[in-house]
Amino acid sequence: MEETIVSKEDVARKVSMKEGTSLFIADEVYALLGDDKFLEDWDSLYYSCEWSNAFFSPSFAKCFYEVFEQEYTPIIIAQFENGNLKALLPLNVEANAVLEQKTFKVKGVGYHYAEYQGWLAERGLEVSFIKEALALLLKTFPTAEIHLKYLPAKIPVDWVSEPAWSAKCALQEWGRPLMRMSDPELPKFFKKRSYKTKLNRLKRSGKLEFKEVTDRNEYADMLPALALQFDFRQGAMFNKKHFQDNPKKTDLMMRLFDAGLLHSTILTLDGEIIASIIAVTGQNWIHLGGINTHSPEHAVHSPGFVHFVLLSEMLSKDENMVFDLTPGGDEYKERLATDRDVTYGLIISNSKKAILKGKARVEFDELMLRQGRRPVSVENDVRKELHIWKHRAKNLTKRGLPKLYDNPKVRLENVYEINKKEDCEQLSFKVKKNHLEDLLLYWSEGNQATRWEALTHFMKSMERGEDVYCVSRNTELMACIWVANGKAIVKSEELSTVFSEEDHVMYHFYCKPQFKKEFSGFFKAIVQQMPVKGHIKALLSKDYKFLIENLNCFKAG
C-alpha cells in the first residue's frame, strides 16, 4: 500500500485522504475532526470493532484533543480505501517534543487520562494495518518511543513475536478483573454480612443517599468537591495533584459529561458527598478509573466500599452490563471480580536500549506479581523514599524549618487538662476542621517534611478517626492541631496508655514561624469549637509549652 510521510516542517498542509495509510499531525488532525464523513466512518469502526471501548470513540478523542490542544500535539495514522476510513491509530505527543527533543514518547490518545489505547480496523485489516502504521510512524520519527497501555482484550498481538517486530517491541500481559452483571452468583455479593454491617453503620450516622447524577448543573456544582477529594488522596498516595496542577482536567471532565461518556454516582451523608465514582462508559461497559473518591473523614465507615457495592447493585439490573474494574493488580479488585480477561502494555521503538529496558521492566513486574506484590506500589515506595531523601539533602544546611508535627512523649508530665471558657477573642482567621482545600496548601518548600509525607499523614490521621484543625493564609497552610477522641484513642497503643475514650486529646502541632504569635489564639479557637462533653486535654512537647504561659486555660493533668 502507498505510504505518505508527513513533513514535520509543514504540519498545516491541506489534508488529503489518499488511498492507503497516511500520517496526520497537528492542524491536519483538527481538519480531520472537522470532517463529518471522517467522524461517521470512525464512529462506524468504533461500534463494529470487537475490542473497541469508549476510549476509542471519536467523541473521546475530540474531547481530549480539543481541551489539551496546547499541551499535546495530536497524531492520527489512518488507512483509506475509495474515500472511506478503514482503520486508524489515534495518538498524541507532548507539545513541541517532536521539534525540541532528540527522543520522545508517543502515546495513545488520552495520555494518562485514557485507561485503554490502541487502534481500530475493519475485519481483515487488524494486523496488516497496525504493522503499516507503526512502520510509518517509526520511519517518520525514528527516535520516537511508542507507548500503548492498556491494549484491550481481543486486540491482536501475535504479530509482536514475528522476527521483524520482536526486536522492536516489549509486550506485557495484565490481567483485567471484571464484574459481569449476568453472573448468577452476583446477587450473593450484595447480601454479604460485611457489606450490610458497613451500610447500616453509615445509615445510623445520618441520612444516607446513593444517586446517579445526570443533570449537568448538579454535576458541575459537585465536581470541585470531588476534585478536592481526588487530589487529596492522589497527593497522599502518589504525590500527584491532577486537578490542582492542571485545571484543564475539570474542562475535560465537563466535556466528557456533555458527550455522554460518563456514568456519575455519588453517596451522600446528610447532604455531604462522602464517596463518588465518575466512570467512562460506552457500549454497555463502565470502566472504573475516571474519578474514584471517598471522604477520609468518614473512612472508618468504608464509604468507598459501600458506594462501590451500591453502584454494582444498580448496574446488576441490566444483565448486559459489564463493570470493568481495570488492570493494575489491585488485590481488592481481584476479590470482587466475577470474571477476568487479559489486556496488554506495548512499547515499540527503534532503540535497542529502550526495548531492553521495557523487557526488563516486564520481568520485574512479573517477579513482583509472583511474590504477591503490586509492581506500581513497589515502584511508588521507592520513588517516595528517593523524593524524601532528596528533600532532606536539600535542607541539610537550613535551620529553623518547622516540623510536620511535634512528637511528645506520652507521659503524664506532658499532659495538661484544659478549662474550656466561653470568652474567645476575635481572630483574624477562620479555623477549619478536616478541610481538604487548606490541607492541600502545605508545601515542601520551607518545611522539614515533604508535601507527600504531610498529605499521607493528614489522610491516615483522618482515616483513624482523628480530626485535623487547620488555618491557611495567602495560599499556604499556616498551622494544624490534631485531635484524637473516642475509638481513635482506643486504637492507639500509645494514647490509650494515658487517655480514655471520653477524652479529646490535642496531641500533634504544626506551625509556620510567621504564625507563632497567633498560634495561641488558634489553639484557643479550637478549644471553643470542641464539644462540652468529655475532657479536653493537651499533650505538649517542650516546643509548644509556651502555650501554658500565653493562655490561662491550662491545669496539670
What positions do the PLM features span?
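Active-site/acyl-donor-binding loops of N-acyltransferases
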Residues: 2-24, 93, 153-187, 318-385, ...
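A generic secondary-structure signal for well-formed alpha-helical elements
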Residues: 46-53, 141, 230-238, 315, ...
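Aromatic (often tryptophan-rich) hydrophobic motifs at membrane interfaces
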Residues: 80, 85, 97, 109, ...
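Acyl-group handling in specialized metabolite and lipid biosynthesis
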Residues: 120-123, 184
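Short secondary-structure capping/junction motifs at helix and strand boundaries
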Residues: 142-148
